[in-house]
Amino acid sequence: MKTVSLLIDMKQKQTKISMVTAYDFPSAKQVEAAGIDMILVGDSLGMTVLGYESTVQVTLADMIHHGRAVRRGAPNTFVVVDMPIGAVGISMTQDLNHALKLYQETNANAIKAEGAHITPFIEKATAIGIPVVAHLGLTPQSVGVMGYKLQGATKEAAEQLILDAKNVEQAGAVALVLEAIPNDLAEEISKHLTIPVIGIGAGKGTDGQVLVYHDMLNYGVEHKAKFVKQFADFSVGVDGLKQYDQEVKSGAFPSEEYTYKKKIMNEVNNND
């Protein structure tokens, strides 16, 4: 199983880190089989697999349920599970209880929490043995306030992001996700941190990249961000479903090839 020290070693050797956001047993199993370094169980599962309008409806129970499934599918991959909205920021005692519950019940390698304001939480969680991945730039749980737009696009905002990144590292974060920020800013932050920096919509200057399984494979998604490249097309599965429907209605399925051949009704009738 990959560890924090191995990920740091990859950064030091300038070996790029691959990360995929996945939400269930079969997708996690595929991700591990592909040799991907890390899996993120993101609260984006709310929209992607649960049909919610946003991440706001995602609960701690949702994250635990899906985190467990992913761990079962990828026992040897570094798994990070999101703290959902409301799980951090109530009180330090409650925050740590939520973090411990998520970490223990999913058997994850780390949890992830969003925003620059969580540095005290990172310090406390680290102190009790919970590895935390920080998330700066565009933070999906805050899109109601900041909107879906490029972050760090002004001199002041860029300087603040650099400071925030240094602060979360100093607080004890084991890695950092940077989302939707300028390429040169992400590269600068990556150079100045000793922990791995994983980018999504942050250019190629980071230590690694993360994309959502469903986005990169075109699986049930209607809108994809500018930074998403499609690596396969799972939407062709709809064609298979249509063919199945046609064959059931026409009687073509199941044919003899898919039917058990043993004759039993003669025996049943002879007993009458």
Curated annotation (Swiss-Prot):
<keyword id="KW-0963">Cytoplasm</keyword>
<protein>
    <recommendedName>
        <fullName>3-methyl-2-oxobutanoate hydroxymethyltransferase</fullName>
        <ecNumber>2.1.2.11</ecNumber>
    </recommendedName>
</protein>
<dbReference type="GO" id="GO:0015940">
    <property type="term" value="P:pantothenate biosynthetic process"/>
</dbReference>
<feature type="binding site">
    <location>
        <position position="82"/>
    </location>
    <ligand>
        <name>Mg(2+)</name>
    </ligand>
</feature>
<comment type="subunit">
    <text>Homodecamer; pentamer of dimers.</text>
</comment>
<dbReference type="GO" id="GO:0003864">
    <property type="term" value="F:3-methyl-2-oxobutanoate hydroxymethyltransferase activity"/>
</dbReference>
<feature type="binding site">
    <location>
        <position position="82"/>
    </location>
    <ligand>
        <name>3-methyl-2-oxobutanoate</name>
    </ligand>
</feature>
<keyword id="KW-0566">Pantothenate biosynthesis</keyword>
<dbReference type="InterPro" id="IPR003700">
    <property type="entry name" value="Pantoate_hydroxy_MeTrfase"/>
</dbReference>
<dbReference type="InterPro" id="IPR040442">
    <property type="entry name" value="Pyrv_kinase-like_dom_sf"/>
</dbReference>
<feature type="active site" description="Proton acceptor">
    <location>
        <position position="179"/>
    </location>
</feature>
<keyword id="KW-0460">Magnesium</keyword>
<dbReference type="Pfam" id="PF02548">
    <property type="entry name" value="Pantoate_transf"/>
</dbReference>
<comment type="pathway">
    <text>Cofactor biosynthesis; (R)-pantothenate biosynthesis; (R)-pantoate from 3-methyl-2-oxobutanoate: step 1/2.</text>
</comment>
<feature type="binding site">
    <location>
        <position position="114"/>
    </location>
    <ligand>
        <name>Mg(2+)</name>
    </ligand>
</feature>
<dbReference type="GO" id="GO:0005737">
    <property type="term" value="C:cytoplasm"/>
</dbReference>
<keyword id="KW-0479">Metal-binding</keyword>
<comment type="similarity">
    <text>Belongs to the PanB family.</text>
</comment>
<feature type="binding site">
    <location>
        <begin position="43"/>
        <end position="44"/>
    </location>
    <ligand>
        <name>3-methyl-2-oxobutanoate</name>
    </ligand>
</feature>
<keyword id="KW-0808">Transferase</keyword>
<feature type="binding site">
    <location>
        <position position="112"/>
    </location>
    <ligand>
        <name>3-methyl-2-oxobutanoate</name>
    </ligand>
</feature>
<comment type="function">
    <text>Catalyzes the reversible reaction in which hydroxymethyl group from 5,10-methylenetetrahydrofolate is transferred onto alpha-ketoisovalerate to form ketopantoate.</text>
</comment>
<dbReference type="GO" id="GO:0000287">
    <property type="term" value="F:magnesium ion binding"/>
</dbReference>
<dbReference type="InterPro" id="IPR015813">
    <property type="entry name" value="Pyrv/PenolPyrv_kinase-like_dom"/>
</dbReference>
<feature type="binding site">
    <location>
        <position position="43"/>
    </location>
    <ligand>
        <name>Mg(2+)</name>
    </ligand>
</feature>
